[in-house]
Amino acid sequence: EFRSLARKWINANAPKEFEQELSKSSLGRIRLAKHDMVEVGKAWQKKKSDGGWACLHWPKEYGGRGATPIERVIWQQEEGVYGKLTQPFQIGEGMCGPTVMAWGSEEAKRRYLPKLASGEEIWCQLFSEPSAGSDVAGLRTRAEKKGDNWVVNGQKIWTSGAHYSDYGLLIARTDPNVPKHKGLTMFFLDMKSPGVEVRPIKQANGMQEFNEVYFTDVVIPDSQR
């Protein structure tokens, strides 16, 4: 029953004008980029949200459907190539959103999660650094407490989608005097904050999916950790 409902909705609402391009895998994505993939993705995400098909496994009160893991897999099978359209939302839906859901305040959940689910806002994660990839504990980006705020200085790299993201999850070192796997704190921040500089990395295939991100005296409220 769930599969037939999903299939019926997708057949009636999917942007079929992109089906041929999307079926060509990465080459299709390069060609689709001429249409502004982020804006096309936002439109598809909003349509899914309006129909009750966005972020299926999330609770309904945060913009999801309350679906089971099996139903989520069925949806992904039925969505097929159109799932590529929402690539800009994959990190937000799969990583950032669930983190806010698990550790954020109720106010933060109700403010940010529905807008992520509806396609209005995009999130990225700011973990890797030039000296900290697989071992994130080697990171050097610092956050220092000043009153009710934290001031962040440092650099991240290989950040997918930072150049079009509205918000990001950031891990920074808040206590340099303890073993490296301790003294780390996670924040979320507005990517348009003063002191945030995003530099896209041009890839050999012509695309720019990854970025360097620099933080210079970026102020983050204590309520965003």
Model-derived regions, located:
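N-terminal glycine-rich flavin-associated loop
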Residues: 88-107, 133
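Flexible, small-/acidic-enriched active-site or ligand-binding loops
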Residues: 192-219
